[in-house]
Amino acid sequence: MEKKMLTEVFYLHEKGSLADARLCTYILDDSDSIAIEKRPMMLICPGGGYEHTSDREAEPLAMHFLSIGYHVAVLRYSVAPAVYPTALLEATASMKLIHEHAKEWYVDTDKIVVQGSSAGGHLAACLAMFWHTKWLAEMAGVTNDILKPAAMLLNYPVVTSGEYAHRGSFKQLLGGNETEELLELLSLEKQVTEHTPPAFIWHTYTDQSVPVQNSLLLIGAMKKYEIPVEFHMYPVGKHGLSTCSRLTAMRDGTGIQKECGSWLPLAKRWLIALRDE
């Protein structure tokens, strides 16, 4: 019997979800010819300033992670006019769905990595920061272990609501309800705890949209808890580079920064080490 990669689309119906909120899964086959019983899973959260989810940071990255032996799920989460916590609840629903299908899909549930770019990095990091909390488990209707990611992989992430904030992301995420309490909660460098998972993070020094200080603040907070971080800062590059190659070039020809593309093999090495622990 011929076996093929399994692709499915699961529509998500959390409180406040938009009609097109969905999880797109790419599941590698379980061939008898390959000595792998279970595979790790990558949950991808594309960027887009909480206004849209970027095609450039979705399937192209999924194909890369599939090529190194990860199952992949791309979360097309709800964006404005949907507001917090809708996207976060869709991320928790995605984790629940992955666990429910773990046996069928041959997923190693101890090796689920959450990945995000830009505002998607903020969503991915929200899950990584809050997975252990009572309030999130109650909102999601699951136990905390279902929500736990093994690690987070962040591309030029939105992190802080403070001095170096990407204001547009927080405006869209909160829909104008930018209370001091919510801004404090969602300034993720302030939410790091001993429960925060290890991270691989990269950013460019010249990012004019999401300043590199976003990553630096998060790394500094993680260092206080001695949580492992691999960080790469490239001297030149605009925001939103994704693969940094023609594969994800913008229609105007920008978005190619070959020297930044080394993040892909560096992340591969990091992910393989994580997988083999």
Predicted segments with their positions:
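N-terminal cap/lid segment of alpha/beta-hydrolase-fold proteins
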Residues: 1-37, 257-260
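Short beta-strand element of the alpha/beta-hydrolase
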Residues: 38-47
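Catalytic nucleophile-loop/oxyanion-hole region of alpha/beta-hydrolase
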Residues: 53-55, 60, 73-109, 257-259
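Primarily recognizes the serine-hydrolase "nucleophile elbow" in alpha/beta-hydrolase
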Residues: 96-166, 179, 183
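Short beta-strand/loop motif that positions the catalytic acidic residue
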Residues: 195, 201-203, 207
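Acidic beta-to-alpha connecting loop that harbors the catalytic carboxylate
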Residues: 205-208, 236-238
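Conserved alpha/beta-hydrolase "acid-adjacent" motif
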Residues: 208-217, 242
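C-terminal catalytic histidine-bearing segment of alpha/beta-hydrolase fold enzymes
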Residues: 219-277
